[in-house]
């Protein structure tokens, strides 16, 4: 029995350490002295209050980890016999509602629901499809596939196939499989050189593009390996990888390859650019802003903020302050986690 306790203790410790590593770069962390029952009761009261006490709902849901939010939803259902998502839908509206509903889904459920929304009805929101499929890790993609199957009783790949076509479809399907090699400790310089040369010979060097070769290399090799490949590529090609993509392919395929290369080179910078694009100029692309803030808040928001300030001269917090208002702004400020 003592041995079982020791093993469980070790597993718990390892789990906690991996969570700590993961959340060290996030802005939303697990709340200490967490009490799901107490939070569920406070949300119930906030919803019942005349005019709805949005502030209480925001402060609870943006200051708890995703696991804790799942516990709150469970406790809420046990207390009220109502689904927390339905209750929030009835009590909130607009962008604030979208943020809060996003926060109470598990991360795989959230990505799966965003992907489903991007493909249902007439036309496809390729931008959302590309962003999620290009930026998630093998493990995240596997979890998304499982959540998608559970939620929609169909396969993610099947929906991608029926909603896309040509080489763009091939690239999306290859990425969605989540078969990228994991990061190894050995640097294979011969393989780096070979891949760089093959990318050049399949594109800029020839008439027409061997897109299949690009897809194989860019969807199967590990991220650190590809970072070195793109660096080495410059010694073969007069253009860097992004410039080569712009010269060789067009439309959704071009957009997808560019997103992919940017994610491989520097994922926090990629998301900083997405956030900037969502807020620059007139009007706000709230869908992109909300998805990025919700999905990255526990993963790498601190890194994203750093890249944002470095590239755009002003903080992410400042941009959110300029572009949003009211309770919606407050929720995003909490997910942003402070000014730089």
Swiss-Prot record:
InterPro entries: Annexin (IPR001464), Annexin_repeat (IPR018502), Annexin_repeat_CS (IPR018252), Annexin_sf (IPR037104), ANX2 (IPR002389). GO terms for molecular function: calcium ion binding; calcium-dependent phospholipid binding; cytoskeletal protein binding; phosphatidylserine binding; phospholipase inhibitor activity. Annexin repeats lie at residues 34-105, 106-177, 190-262, 266-337. SMART domains: ANX. Pfam families: Annexin. Keywords: Annexin, Basement membrane, Calcium, Calcium/phospholipid-binding, Extracellular matrix, Phosphoprotein, Repeat, Secreted. One of its GO terms (biological process) is positive regulation of receptor-mediated endocytosis involved in cholesterol transport. GO terms for cellular component: basement membrane; cytoplasm; extracellular region; nucleus; plasma membrane; vesicle membrane. SUPFAM superfamilies: Annexin. Its main location: secreted. Residues 2-25 are annotated as: P10 binding site. It is found in: Secreted, Extracellular space, Extracellular matrix, Basement membrane. Tetramer of 2 light chains (p10 proteins) and 2 heavy chains (p36 proteins). It may cross-link plasma membrane phospholipids with actin and the cytoskeleton and be involved with exocytosis. Calcium-regulated membrane-binding protein whose affinity for calcium is greatly enhanced by anionic phospholipids. It binds two calcium ions with high affinity. A pair of annexin repeats may form one binding site for calcium and phospholipid. Belongs to the annexin family. PANTHER family: ANNEXIN, ANNEXIN A2-RELATED. This is Annexin A2-A. The lineage of its organism: Eukaryota, Metazoa, Chordata, Craniata, Vertebrata. The gene is anxa2-a.
């Amino acid at each position: 029995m003592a041995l079982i306790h020791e093993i469980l203790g070790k597993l718990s410790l390892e789990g906690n350490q991996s969570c700590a590593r993961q959340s060290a770069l996030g802005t939303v962390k697990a709340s200490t002295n967490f009490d799901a029952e107490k939070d569920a009761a406070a949300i119930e009261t906030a919803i019942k209050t005349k005019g709805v006490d949005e502030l209480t709902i925001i402060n609870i849901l943006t200051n708890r980890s995703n696991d804790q939010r799942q516990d709150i939803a469970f406790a809420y259902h046990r207390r009220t016999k109502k689904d927390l998502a339905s209750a929030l839908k009835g009590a909130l509206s607009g962008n604030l509602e979208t943020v809060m509903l996003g926060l109470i889904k598990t991360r795989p459920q959230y990505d799966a629901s965003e992907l489903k929304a991007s493909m249902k009805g007439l036309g496809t929101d390729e931008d959302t499809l590309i962003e999620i499929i290009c930026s998630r890790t093998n493990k995240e993609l596997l979890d998304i596939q499982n959540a998608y199957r559970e939620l929609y009783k169909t396969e993610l790949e099947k929906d991608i196939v029926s909603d896309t076509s040509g080489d763009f479809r091939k690239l999306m399907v290859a990425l969605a499989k989540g078969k990228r090699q994991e990061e190894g400790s050995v640097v294979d310089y011969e393989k780096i050189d070979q891949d760089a040369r093959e990318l050049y010979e399949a594109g800029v060097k020839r008439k027409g593009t061997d897109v299949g070769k690009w897809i194989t290399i860019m969807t199967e090799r590990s991220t650190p390996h590809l970072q070195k490949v793109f660096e080495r590529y410059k010694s073969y090609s007069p253009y860097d990888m992004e410039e080569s993509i712009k010269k060789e392919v067009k439309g959704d395929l071009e957009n997808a390859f560019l997103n992919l290369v940017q994610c491989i080179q520097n994922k926090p910078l990629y998301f900083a650019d997405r956030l900037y694009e969502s807020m620059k100029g007139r009007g706000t692309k709230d869908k992109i802003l909300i998805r990025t803030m919700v999905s990255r808040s526990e993963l790498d928001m601190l890194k994203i903020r750093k890249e944002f300030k470095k590239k755009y001269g002003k903080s992410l917090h400042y941009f959110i302050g300029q572009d949003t208002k009211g309770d919606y702004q407050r929720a995003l400020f909490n997910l942003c986690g402070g000014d730089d």
